[in-house]
C-alpha cells in the first residue's frame, strides 16, 4: 500500500523505519519544520525528517497544515492509500483525514480512551498506572476519539523513566503497525474501500473505561515538592524525565532517576544494594533534607513519608552525572535541605 507518514520526534522513527523495511511504499513524509538549536543557533531536522532524507523520501514541513492549502493539495496528489500519523504535532484538517480511500490512522501511546491527548506516557506514570500500551485507531475530527483497530498492552515498570517507556512503546508500535496494515490490506483487498474495515473496529464508547484526557504538562508540575509522599516524588522524577527539578540556594538542579525507600521496595533494595540502605526506610527526616551521601551510588532525601534515593542528576549547564558526583558538584552534606 502507498502511505503518507506523518511524524516528528524520536518516538516516530522506529515506526517509519518499519514501513521503509516492509513491502509498503512510503510515498511522502510530513513533519514539523526545522528548529533552531539553542547552542550555535543552527537549524536542525526533526528525527523523522532525517530518516526520510536518508531514504530519499519526499518531505513536506508545514508550519500549520490546517492553513496551508498548497501543501494540502501536494499531499492529496501523492494519491496514498492511507495516512499514518505518529506524534506529528499538529491537528490535521478533515480534507486530509478523508482524502485517502483507506482513511487516516493514528498510533497513540495509551490504552484508549484513557489518556487521550498530548502527554499520555507522562500522565500514566504520574498517576501510578501499572499498565499502558498503544492503540492503532481510525482518525476522526475528535481528539483521539476514533474507533480502534488494534490495542496492545504494556506493563509499566516503576523503575523505568518516561524516556525508557516511550522507547518500549515505540518498539511495540513498530511491530504492531505491520500487523495492522495487513489487517487493513486484507479487509479491503478487492475494493480499497474503508467500509470493508469497519467490522474489525471497536468503538471507544464500548470500552470498559471512561475517557480521561492527558492534559498538557505545566511548568509547575516539573518542580519537585518534597512535602509529597515518596512514591509521588518518584513518579514525578521518572514520569517527567529528564526535566523534574529541585532547587538549592536558588539554583535549579534536575533529578533524573530514583528509588523510593519504602517497604514495598524492600526486597528490590535488599537484592541490589548494600544492606545498610534498607535501614533508611525507618529514618525520620524533614522533607527535602539530605540524609546521606553515598559514594558510587547517590544521595538520600527526606519526604513527607519515606526517604527517596536519588541516582542521577544534573546541574544547569552541565551533563547528567551519577548523584554522588552531583552531590560533590553542589556541595551536598547531611542536614542540608533543598529549597
Curated annotation (Swiss-Prot):
Segments forming a coiled coil: none
Identification of the protein by name: Methionyl-tRNA formyltransferase
Organism taxonomic ancestry: Bacteria, Bacillati, Cyanobacteriota, Cyanophyceae, Synechococcales
Disulphide bonds in the chain: none
HAMAP family named among the record's database cross-references: Formyl_trans (MF_00182)
One of the record's GO molecular function terms: methionyl-tRNA formyltransferase activity
Catalysis performed (reactions): L-methionyl-tRNA(fMet) + (6R)-10-formyltetrahydrofolate = N-formyl-L-methionyl-tRNA(fMet) + (6S)-5,6,7,8-tetrahydrofolate + H(+)
Highest rank taxon of the organism: Bacteria
Family: Belongs to the Fmt family.
Gene3D superfamilies (alphabetical): 3.40.50.12230
Amino acid at each position: 500500500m502507498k502511505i503518507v507518514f506523518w511524524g516528528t520526534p524520536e518516538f516516530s522513527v522506529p515506526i517509519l523505519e518499519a514501513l521503509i523495511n516492509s513491502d509498503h511504499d512510503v510515498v511522502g513524509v510530513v513533519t514539523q519544520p526545522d528548529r533552531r538549536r539553542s547552542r550555535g543557533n543552527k537549524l536542525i531536522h526533526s528525527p523523522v525528517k532525517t530518516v526520510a532524507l536518508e531514504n530519499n523520501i519526499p518531505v513536506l514541513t508545514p508550519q500549520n497544515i490546517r492553513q496551508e492549502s498548497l501543501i494540502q493539495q501536494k499531499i492529496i496528489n501523492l494519491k496514498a492509500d492511507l495516512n499514518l500519523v505518529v506524534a506529528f504535532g499538529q491537528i490535521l484538517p478533515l480534507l486530509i483525514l478523508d482524502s485517502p480511500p483507506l482513511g487516516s490512522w493514528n498510533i497513540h501511546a495509551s490504552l484508549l480512551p484513557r489518556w487521550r491527548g498530548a502527554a499520555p506516557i507522562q500522565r500514566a506514570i504520574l498517576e501510578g498506572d501499572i499498565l499502558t500500551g498503544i492503540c492503532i485507531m481510525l482518525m476522526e475530527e475528535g481528539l483521539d476519539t476514533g474507533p480502534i483497530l488494534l490495542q496492545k498492552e504494556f506493563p509499566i515498570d516503576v523503575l523505568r523513566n518516561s524516556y525508557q517507556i516511550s522507547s518500549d512503546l515505540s518498539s511495540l508500535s513498530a511491530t504492531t503497525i505491520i500487523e495492522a496494515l495487513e489487517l487493513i490490506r486484507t479487509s479491503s483487498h478487492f475494493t480499497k474501500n474503508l467500509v470493508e474495515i469497519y467490522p474489525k473496529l471497536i468503538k471507544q464508547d464500548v470500552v470498559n473505561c471512561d475517557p480521561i484526557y492527558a492534559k498538557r504538562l505545566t511548568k509547575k508540575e516539573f518542580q519537585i515538592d518534597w512535602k509529597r509522599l515518596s512514591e509521588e516524588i518518584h513518579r514525578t522524577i521518572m514520569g517527567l524525565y529528564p526535566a523534574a527539578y529541585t532547587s538549592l540556594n536558588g539554583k535549579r538542579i534536575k533529578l533524573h532517576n530514583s528509588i523510593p525507600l519504602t517497604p514495598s521496595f524492600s526486597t528490590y533494595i535488599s537484592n541490589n544494594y548494600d544492606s545498610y540502605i534498607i535501614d533508611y526506610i525507618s529514618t525520620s527526616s524533614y522533607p527535602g533534607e539530605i540524609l546521606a551521601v553515598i559514594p558510587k551510588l547517590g544521595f538520600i532525601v527526606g519526604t513527607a513519608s519515606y526517604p527517596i534515593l536519588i541516582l542521577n542528576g544534573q546541574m544547569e549547564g552541565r551533563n547528567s552525572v551519577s548523584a554522588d558526583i552531583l552531590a560533590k558538584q553542589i556541595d551536598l552534606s547531611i542536614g542540608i535541605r533543598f529549597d
